[in-house]
Amino acid sequence: MSNTVVTGEVLDKSIREVVRILEDAVGCTAGPKGLTVAISKPYGSPEITKDGYKVMKSIKPEEPLAAAIASIITQSASQCNDKVGDGTTTCSILTAKVIEEVSKAKAAGSDIVSIKNGILKAKEAVLTALMSMRREVEEDEIAQVATLSANGDKNIGSKIAQCVKEVGKDGVITVEESKGFKDLEVEKTDGMQFDRGYLSPYFVTNAEKMLVEFENPYIFLTEKKINLVQSILPILENVARSGRPLLIIAEDVEGEALSTLVLNKLRGGLQVAAVKAPGFGDRRKDMLGDIAVIVGAKYVVNDELAVKMEDIALSDLGTAKSVRITKDATTIIGSVDSSSESIASRTNQIKAQIENSSSDYDKEKLRERLAKLSGGVAVLKVGGSSEVEVKERKDRVEDALHATRAAVEEGVVPGGGAALLYALSSLDGLKGKNDDEQWGIDIIRRAACAPIKRIIKNSGSEEAPCVIQHLLKQNDKELIYNVDTMNYANAFTSGVMDPLKVVRIAFDLAVSLAAVFMTLNAVVVDVPSKNDAAGAGAGGMGGMGGMGGF
């Protein structure tokens, strides 16, 4: 394997081509009238989706230079997805436009550093303007925000609003596939979520979404650190014989114990995952007790308990209908053995502690525990007549749920690309130090119009320039263009709102990514040599040598 260095016009041309391909594929999904994309799979039928992030991840050019450029862009999109769970499509549209405009500046021989300074100066002004437009989302507007993010599906919007009403704005809402034919159902169940993720990515069962997903697992709870596997070996053996997964919640799992669990998982043995217990000190002890009540565990093993880890039987462990673990959080859904009486008793105990406490801090922490214990979990069950239909609908439900959470967290701004358009007024008095810096400011002025133009284009209309001109003339920052009705309306009365957090992060990341490409002078890429190609072709089973490793 040799490599080559790509620079100059060849590099710039490749960047433009890759960005255009990504924008064409991802941008077509924008807006309520956006189109779907089919993604082929190694096995089975193609997946149909309107999820911009999923489309972007699936694009893997064969040519090494194009693949390297696409990888850089996808990493940025993944940051958008990780931070807010939505906005990838907007991010890709903005990135493509900024890079297109920067390419023109480069071709004209402009100073790239000055242009970059102008772009970053304009970015800060636009972000400040976006913040000034925000307003808190009202409870009756939650359905509208979710509907817009679900590409106009009012059923999804109303069901998400129902979930928020049942478990509260800070409650736990999850999405899972249903075996039934109903499009979408809401099920409220006992459960809890806490801010601790898996201790090793090797525990992941869903590699595409980097999740651990267990059905009907056993749950072992301890306040102690687990360093040696010997102490939990009887538990592991008993659970392995049952054929069910195991979740370990402990102060920590490290050293030999963690490496043994990972090795066992990689070899296809026991389905197991470990997470750290939430909280610290006495609060950790209390929260483990809360979890034990929810999952029906008889013991939380600690130094004060007469029962040792080695003596724990299957009947002493907790159970749940399902468990979902990300790198940051663990969600336990639907206890199996826990009774409503035990949860009621525990909540009454916490309420009494709140009444008797004189510390505001302690009261706040007790209220947090009470909310987690009594709030439960709302499960959005997605069904359909085919696997393709279910997966496409599930993508939209997840996007809508992320958008709803973002709206609750930071508020909303006028939707349909209008917020970025109106934020451009902040650039009117902004002047660059020189012509090239001013060019950078003007690049942001043109790029910020790209999302609304794309949304209008996806609706089948070619009237974007006229629409933009009309919106800016009215001097009303709540006015939007509704592509569903092909008419102008008030953003908040018509329900065409975007979560500020989604717009803000998508814009910020897009400009930052474009700035990276602006100063990119060379890319070193691997090029397969003739000897590599000959070696790969010798012997049809030659590729099996890697089976011995991980």
UniProtKB/Swiss-Prot annotation:
Residues annotated as binding ATP: T29, A30, G31, P32, K50, D86, G87, T88, T89, T90, G416, D498
Organism from which the protein derives: Anaplasma phagocytophilum (strain HZ)
Subunit structure comment from the entry: Forms a cylinder of 14 subunits composed of two heptameric rings stacked back-to-back. Interacts with the co-chaperonin GroES.
Swiss-Prot/TrEMBL keywords: ATP-binding, Chaperone, Cytoplasm, Isomerase, Nucleotide-binding
Higher taxonomy: Bacteria, Pseudomonadati, Pseudomonadota, Alphaproteobacteria, Rickettsiales
Protein name per UniProt: Chaperonin GroEL
Entry EC no(s): 5.6.1.7
GO cellular component, one term: cytoplasm
InterPro entries xrefs: Chaperonin_Cpn60_CS (IPR018370), Cpn60/GroEL (IPR001844), Cpn60/GroEL/TCP-1 (IPR002423), GroEL-like_apical_dom_sf (IPR027409), GROEL-like_equatorial_sf (IPR027413), TCP-1-like_intermed_sf (IPR027410)
Catalytic reaction annotation: ATP + H2O + a folded polypeptide = ADP + phosphate + an unfolded polypeptide
GO molecular function, one term: ATP binding
Top-level taxon in the UniProt lineage: Bacteria
Function: Together with its co-chaperonin GroES, plays an essential role in assisting protein folding. The GroEL-GroES system forms a nano-cage that allows encapsulation of the non-native substrate proteins and provides a physical environment optimized to promote and accelerate protein folding.
Main localization, broad class: cytoplasm
